[in-house]
Amino acid sequence: MKNLRKLKENSNCEFQIPFAPYGGLFLHKDLIGLIGYPNRKYFVYADDFEYTNRIQLLGGKLILLSNCKVSDLETVWHSKVSKCPFVSRYLNQSSFHTYYSTRNNVYFSRKYLVNSNIKYKVNMIVFLFAMIFVAILCMSFKRYVFLIIAIRDGFRENLDEMA
């Protein structure tokens, strides 16, 4: 909260962050020799977070410059508006987006962010119960099953590409 107030008061703030998207990322070429290249197993989605997280793990710093503006060439895939007002981005997108973004985020979160497996699993159960109600309201049962498969593969550390 303190950093949020600081950001509102001064638009020229710098914040240290644990990981970042590729968009707007600047790094010295020698850093690539230390951290290597992005992990191909992620294929798409969360590969940028895993890659930049390695900088932090090796003692480096990622600094967010709040006064810089980045124009992204790609549109955000989960910004589509749904006909069902309760729909989640997890139940409204293509199978490709749903599967890889969910699976990779589950894998990344469990590997690098989770401090308590019990809390994580309880949170996951609550999330899945909420999603089943959304699936019922929006008639998205197949998408819900696909979401569960993606979560299962993330838990099992299965980062193979789908056929």
State what each model feature region is.
Residues 49-50, 96-103, 145, 149:
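A structural signal for well-ordered alpha-helical segments within the folded catalytic domains
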Residues 111-163:
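Non-catalytic, C-terminal membrane-associated alpha-helical segments of glycosyltransferases
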Residues 65-89:
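Active-site donor/metal-binding and catalytic loop motifs
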Residues 85-99:
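A short acidic, glycine-rich active-site loop
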Residues 7-27, 89:
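A recurrent flexible, glycine/aromatic-enriched loop bordering the glycosyltransferase active site
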Residues 1-4:
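Core nucleotidyl-transferase/polymerase catalytic module
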Residues 25, 31-36, 41-68:
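A short, conserved alpha-helix in the catalytic core of glycosyltransferases
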